[in-house]
């Protein structure tokens, strides 16, 4: 498996004839809500040209919550902003509902942007206007009649749970309430796509969960396609259906969240997800050696379960097949997208099986098992 594109669709990227061929080979592309084809973005400055994005081939399906992650400067914001043409690609195409938005004139761009909502980290509310007025403003600018505006604002404030705050000013609101106003404002034109740029980064963990719950509800009730970028891996884990990992403007990994988070392939993915992974307890790391120091040395195994779809991994069967005394030093099992993802650090003492047979037995029940070392 190569270092890049482990879970990517093999997309051709040239003319209309090849697009038709792709649609036949990959019918899911016909259903893609947003599609990037060989997308590139280069910025030109005093220091010369800087490539922010290159060779991006990606399809986002209608109604899914799609996450974009990567280190700082990986190209996340540049990519998401090409969807509503706040960024003009240097090469390649962006298709929405199979229509190339690169060919849109100014009038069509205005119409496009009304169909794509966007929320930000810092809310961007007008401090001198009430909650009601902040939500109403885009409708007013668009020339929507007053009675229709009132109906829509009432509906949206109820959706985001702020119907009792309609007369409040931003300074009187908490961070979570401000973001709810931002979400309501982003929905005024009944968008089909909602872009979220670090929408929870300024919020505390409890408020973050409430905003994620609201986004999940909006996705389910309204059928919105949600595309979000964040540096908080737990946000991706908790809400997204699929995720793409960017590094230096290139896609290095993509797939269902349970798959990428449960068994990351690329080194960048592993680094980004490291805070969510279990580490070896310090007291055991200090006692660890690469080779057994005596015949009865205990072996330390790092065991990963990925994508178990029923009740979860059969730990009793695993412990029985390993033999000897099995001690769980650290570990846990969580569910992502109704699949069990487990990570266990096991100490096995007195097993009758030699190392290679032990690994073979373990791998029959868990997809990834590694020897961390020996104790004793």
Swiss-Prot record:
A cellular-component GO term for this protein: plasma membrane
Source organism, top-level taxon: Bacteria
Alphabetical keyword list: Amino-acid transport, ATP-binding, Cell inner membrane, Cell membrane, Membrane, Nucleotide-binding, Translocase, Transport
Reaction catalysed by this enzyme: L-methionine(out) + ATP + H2O = L-methionine(in) + ADP + phosphate + H(+); D-methionine(out) + ATP + H2O = D-methionine(in) + ADP + phosphate + H(+)
GO molecular function: ABC-type D-methionine transporter activity; ATP binding; ATP hydrolysis activity
Domain ABC transporter, residue spans: 34-273
Main localisation: membrane
Residues the record lists as binding ATP: 70-77
EC number, as in UniProt: 7.4.2.11
One Pfam entry name: NIL
Entry's localization field: Cell inner membrane
EC class of the enzyme, as a word: translocase
Protein's membrane topology: Peripheral membrane protein
Assembly with partners or alone: The complex is composed of two ATP-binding proteins (MetN), two transmembrane proteins (MetI) and a solute-binding protein (MetQ).
Family designation: Belongs to the ABC transporter superfamily. Methionine importer (TC 3.A.1.24) family.
Its biological purpose: Part of the ABC transporter complex MetNIQ involved in methionine import. Responsible for energy coupling to the transport system.
Protein name per its UniProtKB record: Methionine import ATP-binding protein MetN 1
Originating organism: Pseudomonas syringae pv. tomato (strain ATCC BAA-871 / DC3000)
């Amino acid at each position: 498996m190569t270092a890049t594109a482990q879970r990517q669709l093999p997309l051709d990227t040239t003319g209309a004839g090849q697009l038709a061929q792709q649609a036949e080979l990959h019918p899911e592309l016909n259903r893609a809500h947003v599609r990037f084809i060989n997308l590139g973005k280069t910025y030109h400055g005093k220091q010369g040209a800087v490539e922010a994005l290159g060779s991006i081939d990606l399809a986002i399906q209608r109604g899914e919550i799609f996450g974009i992650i990567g280190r700082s400067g990986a190209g996340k914001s540049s990519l998401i902003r090409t969807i509503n043409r706040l960024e003009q690609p240097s090469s390649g195409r962006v298709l929405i509902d199979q229509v190339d938005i690169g060919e849109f004139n100014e009038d069509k761009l205005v119409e496009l942007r009304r169909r794509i909502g966007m929320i930000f980290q810092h809310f961007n509310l007008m401090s001198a206007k009430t909650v009601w007025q902040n939500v109403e403003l885009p409708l007013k600018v668009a020339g929507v009649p007053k009675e229709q505006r009132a109906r829509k604002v009432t509906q949206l404030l109820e959706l985001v749970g702020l119907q009792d705050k309609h007369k409040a000013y931003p300074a009187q609101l908490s961070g979570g309430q401000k973001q709810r106003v931002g979400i309501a404002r982003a929905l005024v034109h009944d968008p089909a796509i909602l872009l979220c740029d670090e929408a929870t980064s300024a919020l505390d963990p409890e408020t973050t969960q409430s905003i994620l719950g609201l986004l999940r509800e909006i996705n389910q009730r309204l059928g919105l396609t949600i595309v979000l970028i964040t540096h908080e891996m737990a946000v991706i884990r908790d809400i997204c259906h699929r995720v793409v990992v960017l590094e230096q403007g290139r896609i290095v990994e993509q797939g269902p969240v349970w798959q990428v988070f449960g068994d990351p392939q690329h080194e960048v993915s592993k680094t980004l997800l490291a805070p969510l992974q279990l580490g070896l307890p310090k007291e055991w790391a200090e006692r660890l050696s690469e080779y057994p120091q005596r015949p009865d040395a205990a072996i330390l195994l790092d065991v990963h379960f990925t994508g178990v779809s029923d009740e979860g991994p059969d730990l009793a069967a695993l412990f029985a097949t390993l033999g000897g005394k099995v001690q769980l030093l650290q570990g846990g099992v969580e569910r992502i997208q109704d699949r069990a993802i487990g990570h266990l650090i096991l100490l096995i003492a007195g097993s009758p099986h030699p190392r290679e047979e032990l690994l073979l037995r373990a791998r029959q029940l868990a997809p990834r098992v590694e020897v961390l070392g020996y104790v004793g």
